[in-house]
Amino acid sequence: MVCLFGVGIGSGCGCTNYRNEEDAYDIEAKYGYSPDEMFNVTFFNTRVEQFYQFYKKDMISNLGTMDEGLYCLKRLEDAGKLKCIITRDIFSLARRAGCQNVYELHGSVYKNTCPHCGREYPLEYIRDSKGAPVCEDCGSVIRPGVSMVGEIVDNGLISQAAEEV
């Protein structure tokens, strides 16, 4: 068995969902840009301070709480009945529930990287930094470990996930 789930699982757990109409309206009123405009690779590259203000306050401030359905997936995996989970969730809900074989097609807020030197940073470093987080080694702005609007999902990862199905 293979489990496929999208961002809806996160909404059910209370994770931030900027695609929710009411939340999207509130974000646009707050920042003057829609969530799709702000959670965009071009916005990140040209307005990094504004991007991180939005990202920290409105994207990663509420990572949700685990629900029984996620722990059920872990039990199925432990019993050898669940081959893998393929998800668009960026909050690593399946991994947080203890599942091992997870394909996070859109990445994870928990894995962040310096685009210059490759050093990895945990979510806490991003969240606790003042302004845009910078690499301690080279000073470059750290890149969130998630696919943003306007980016292509890793084709190799898509191929691996397709092989599982």
Task: Map each language-model feature to its residues.
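Conserved catalytic core of sirtuin-type NAD+-dependent deacylases
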Residues: 1-165
